[in-house]
Protein backbone atom coordinates (compact mmCIF):
# COMPACT_ATOMS: atom_id res chain seq x y z
CA UNK A 1 0.00 0.00 0.00
CA UNK A 2 1.17 3.52 -0.78
CA UNK A 3 0.84 6.17 1.93
CA UNK A 4 1.32 9.93 2.15
CA UNK A 5 3.15 10.73 5.38
CA UNK A 6 5.74 12.91 7.08
CA UNK A 7 9.45 12.14 6.95
CA UNK A 8 11.51 13.86 9.65
CA UNK A 9 14.60 15.86 8.91
CA UNK A 10 16.39 18.75 10.55
CA UNK A 11 18.60 18.82 13.61
CA UNK A 12 17.99 17.72 17.18
CA UNK A 13 15.48 20.14 18.68
CA UNK A 14 14.79 21.75 15.27
CA UNK A 15 12.40 19.42 13.43
CA UNK A 16 11.64 19.75 9.73
CA UNK A 17 9.28 17.40 7.92
CA UNK A 18 9.02 16.44 4.26
CA UNK A 19 5.60 15.34 3.03
CA UNK A 20 6.34 12.22 0.99
CA UNK A 21 4.64 9.39 -0.86
CA UNK A 22 6.13 6.07 0.22
CA UNK A 23 5.41 2.36 0.47
CA UNK A 24 3.90 1.56 3.86
CA UNK A 25 6.55 -1.11 4.53
CA UNK A 26 9.46 1.34 4.24
CA UNK A 27 10.68 3.02 7.44
CA UNK A 28 9.67 6.59 8.25
CA UNK A 29 12.80 8.32 6.97
CA UNK A 30 13.65 5.70 4.34
CA UNK A 31 13.18 5.56 0.59
CA UNK A 32 10.22 7.44 -0.85
CA UNK A 33 8.50 7.64 -4.24
CA UNK A 34 7.88 11.39 -4.46
CA UNK A 35 8.23 14.48 -2.28
CA UNK A 36 5.02 16.52 -2.20
CA UNK A 37 6.05 19.38 0.04
CA UNK A 38 7.32 20.28 3.48
CA UNK A 39 6.20 21.33 6.95
CA UNK A 40 8.36 23.44 9.25
CA UNK A 41 6.74 23.64 12.72
CA UNK A 42 9.41 26.07 13.96
CA UNK A 43 9.03 28.59 11.11
CA UNK A 44 9.19 32.26 12.03
CA UNK A 45 6.62 34.80 10.82
CA UNK A 46 8.60 35.74 7.71
CA UNK A 47 9.38 32.11 6.76
CA UNK A 48 7.15 29.72 4.87
CA UNK A 49 6.02 26.99 7.25
CA UNK A 50 3.97 24.75 4.97
CA UNK A 51 3.99 23.98 1.26
CA UNK A 52 2.02 21.20 -0.45
CA UNK A 53 1.77 20.50 -4.19
CA UNK A 54 -2.02 20.12 -4.36
CA UNK A 55 -2.07 18.75 -7.92
CA UNK A 56 0.28 15.88 -7.05
CA UNK A 57 -1.59 15.21 -3.79
CA UNK A 58 -4.83 14.91 -5.75
CA UNK A 59 -3.17 12.55 -8.23
CA UNK A 60 -1.81 10.21 -5.56
CA UNK A 61 -5.15 10.09 -3.76
CA UNK A 62 -6.88 9.29 -7.06
CA UNK A 63 -4.65 6.24 -7.58
CA UNK A 64 -5.34 4.95 -4.06
CA UNK A 65 -2.73 6.43 -1.73
CA UNK A 66 -3.85 6.80 1.90
CA UNK A 67 -2.96 9.93 3.89
CA UNK A 68 -1.84 9.83 7.50
CA UNK A 69 -4.05 11.74 9.97
CA UNK A 70 -1.34 14.37 10.45
CA UNK A 71 -1.04 14.97 6.70
CA UNK A 72 -4.83 15.31 6.47
CA UNK A 73 -4.70 17.98 9.20
CA UNK A 74 -1.91 19.83 7.38
CA UNK A 75 -3.81 19.71 4.07
CA UNK A 76 -6.82 21.33 5.76
CA UNK A 77 -4.51 23.93 7.32
CA UNK A 78 -2.95 24.69 3.91
CA UNK A 79 -6.40 25.03 2.31
CA UNK A 80 -7.39 27.49 5.02
CA UNK A 81 -4.24 29.56 4.37
CA UNK A 82 -4.95 29.65 0.62
CA UNK A 83 -8.51 30.93 1.12
From Swiss-Prot:
NCBIfam families: S16 (TIGR00002). It holds the Pfam family Ribosomal_S16. One of its GO terms (molecular function) is structural constituent of ribosome. SUPFAM superfamilies: Ribosomal protein S16. GO terms for biological process: translation. Signal peptide: none annotated. It comes from the Bacteria. InterPro entries: Ribosomal_bS16 (IPR000307), Ribosomal_bS16_CS (IPR020592), Ribosomal_bS16_dom_sf (IPR023803). This is Small ribosomal subunit protein bS16. Belongs to the bacterial ribosomal protein bS16 family. The keyword Ribonucleoprotein applies. Transmembrane segments: none annotated. The keyword Kinase does not apply.
Amino acid sequence: MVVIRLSRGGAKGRPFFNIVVADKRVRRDGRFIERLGFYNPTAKENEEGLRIMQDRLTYWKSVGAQSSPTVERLVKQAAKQMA
